[in-house]
Amino acid sequence: MKPAARRKARILALQAIYSWQLSGNAIADIEQQMLIENDVTKIDVEYFKDLASGVAVNYKQLDEAVSPHLTRPFDELDMVERAILRLSSYELKFREDVPYKVAINESIELAKMFGAEDSHKFVNGVLDKAVKHLRK
């Protein structure tokens, strides 16, 4: 798949993870709804599903891996930042086919698109520290 298809998959996965965090609904139901509501012709659908379901299944482990690198408890983070850190942590830990620099850069871009003003700086700082523990 083209890098653009993966970026679109990450964007959709971020939206699914955010929705899952807010609603508590089953991630499979959220994935299905996202696929119905969006034009998926230029999205790596399998990658989207892997990211969204992978985060939902492994979120506790991902949160624990990132938490030591935070200045406040994970559950006090902004919901968007929480979703971005979970998504990127999943990529770093479970998707070794994705170079760590790509995973971090894509997360920074997501933070610029969806996060607060300096969210991208925060995400970058946390991931720069956490990558050593996530990617062994």
UniProtKB/Swiss-Prot annotation:
Keyword terms, alphabetized: RNA-binding, Transcription, Transcription antitermination, Transcription regulation
GO cellular component, one term: cytosol
Biological processes, Gene Ontology terms: DNA-templated transcription termination; transcription antitermination
Coiled coil: none
Gene3D superfamilies reported for this sequence: NusB-like (1.10.940.10)
Database matches in InterPro entries: NusB-like_sf, NusB_fam, NusB_RsmB_TIM44
Pfam families with a match to the protein in the record: NusB
Keyword Transmembrane listed: no
GO molecular function, one term: RNA binding
HAMAP family noted in UniProt: NusB
Family designation: Belongs to the NusB family.
UniProt function note: Involved in transcription antitermination. Required for transcription of ribosomal RNA (rRNA) genes. Binds specifically to the boxA antiterminator sequence of the ribosomal RNA (rrn) operons.
Protein name as it appears in the record: Transcription antitermination protein NusB
Gene source species: Pseudoalteromonas translucida (strain TAC 125)
Gene: nusB
